[in-house]
């Protein structure tokens, strides 16, 4: 009876199927949106030393240009998600993209550090309207058979956006100035936002609801109480925390003996992020064949293997280890995020918002806490810390595999 009911619901909903014109439009739109979002978010990372030099800042103070945006973005996702339940998915994503692009261009004209940090905080808040809602749009509008593949392509767009944002801003800042680099990133993002607005089909399976604060909190509570979703939230926390920590401190290692790499050479390590362009959609395809749980476990193990490989003091082998680690990370994130979207039958936006909240929270917590291990044991300490957390992620994945575990609450 339940199976017949689920089939009837699938027929009633107007899902977008793979290999159709609308599906291709969704891919182009979400790719453009992901590119704009993460190029704006990470464009300042490569020019933090320039901020330090111009405004006489310590590295910690300079990092506020990035951390101010990520903090407000993670917090904003808890509110912009439910807000989209009222005004619609496409409306809030389009508005958020245009606001973020405009704020980035305005930021390029600022001459005081406080103004830059404030504008970056507002930019992060605006971007939360895209990050929190895009995954929900995909899970609502894309046919379940194509959901994982589409989610993987969306994450690929995010990956390319983050990579090009870092690379382009670095080149333009060195050639001209940091303000020119931000202006160009803002203009490119504005154009990408236009593509997003034009190509993204309006929601067909979305029903507008009024905000009830108590009901909204209750929905968040239900998602946290659900064991499957809660474990996926923790896995997301571990994933992003591990990824950011490794790339935060690998530069310090490669500046030391026996490598002595310069800053520009270390900056090229961001090209490793492009492994996500392949591994994210590939994981989506493999999920339909081997199921999500198996793909998640294998992807986490790839991260662990990659990190073990980086223990060798040969540059080529370290880079190989980072490539394997990154490929496993993007495959894991694509798998876990699509799992959250498909598993949460009710309050999808709250489930997605919580996953992304934990995901970016892991970046802040691990990135800072990793400094303790670097100070005492350098790269070995970082590796032991991250490998331990990844094994905990594998443990949670095996717990999710237990048949008697499904659909249970704490």
Curated annotation (Swiss-Prot):
Q: State the UniProt keywords alphabetically.
A: Cell membrane, Membrane, Transmembrane, Transmembrane helix, Transport
Instruction: Answer whether the UniProt record assigns the keyword Cell membrane to this protein.
Output: yes
Q: Give the Gene Ontology MF terms in alphabetical order.
A: transmembrane transporter activity
**Bilayer disposition of the protein:** Multi-pass membrane protein
Keyword Cell membrane applies: yes
Q: Which InterPro entries match?
A: MFS, MFS_dom, MFS_trans_sf, Sugar_transporter_CS
Q: What's the protein here called?
A: Uncharacterized transporter BU588
Top-level taxon in the UniProt lineage: Bacteria
Q: Name the family the entry cites.
A: Belongs to the major facilitator superfamily.
Where this protein primarily resides, as one coarse class?
A: membrane
């Amino acid at each position: 009876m339940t199976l017949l009911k689920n089939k009837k619901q699938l027929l009633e909903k107007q899902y977008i199927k793979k290999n159709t014109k609308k599906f291709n439009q969704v891919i182009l739109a979400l790719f453009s949106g992901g590119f704009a979002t993460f190029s704006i978010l990470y464009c300042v990372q490569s020019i933090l030393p320039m901020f330090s030099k111009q405004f006489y800042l310590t590295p910690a103070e300079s990092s506020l240009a990035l951390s101010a945006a990520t903090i407000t973005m993670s917090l904003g996702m808890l509110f912009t998600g439910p807000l989209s339940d009222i005004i619609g998915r496409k409306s809030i994503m389009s508005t958020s993209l245009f606001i973020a692009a405009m704020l980035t261009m305005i930021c390029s004209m600022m001459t005081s550090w406080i103004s830059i940090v404030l504008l970056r905080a507002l930019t992060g808040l605006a971007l939360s309207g895209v990050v929190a809602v895009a995954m929900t749009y995909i899970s609502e509008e894309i046919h379940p058979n194509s959901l994982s593949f589409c989610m993987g392509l969306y994450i690929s767009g995010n990956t390319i956006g983050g990579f090009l944002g870092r690379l382009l801003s670095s080149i333009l800042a060195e050639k001209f100035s940091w303000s020119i680099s931000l202006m160009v990133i803002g203009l490119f993002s504005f154009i990408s936002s236009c593509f997003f607005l034009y190509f993204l089909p309006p929601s067909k399976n979305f029903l507008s609801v009024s905000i009830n604060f108590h009901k909204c909190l209750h929905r968040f509570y239900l998602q946290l109480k659900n064991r499957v979703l809660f474990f996926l939230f923790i896995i997301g926390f571990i994933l992003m925390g591990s990824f950011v920590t490794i790339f935060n401190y690998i530069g310090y290692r490669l500046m030391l003996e026996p490598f002595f790499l310069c800053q520009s050479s270390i900056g090229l390590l961001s090209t490793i992020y492009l492994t996500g362009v392949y591994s994210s959609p590939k994981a989506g395809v493999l999920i339909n064949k081997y199921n999500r749980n198996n793909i998640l476990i294998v992807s986490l193990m790839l991260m662990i293997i990659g990190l073990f490989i980086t223990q060798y003091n040969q540059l080529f082998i370290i880079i190989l280890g980072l490539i394997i680690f990154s490929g496993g990370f993007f495959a894991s994130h694509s798998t876990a995020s699509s799992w959250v979207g498909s598993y949460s039958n009710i309050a999808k936006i709250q489930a997605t918002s919580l996953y992304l909240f934990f995901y970016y929270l892991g970046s802040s917590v691990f990135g800072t806490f990793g400094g303790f291990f670097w100070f005492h044991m350098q790269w070995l300490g970082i590796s032991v810390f991250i490998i331990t957390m990844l094994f905990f992620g594998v443990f949670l994945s095996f717990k999710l595999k237990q048949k008697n575990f499904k659909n249970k609450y704490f």
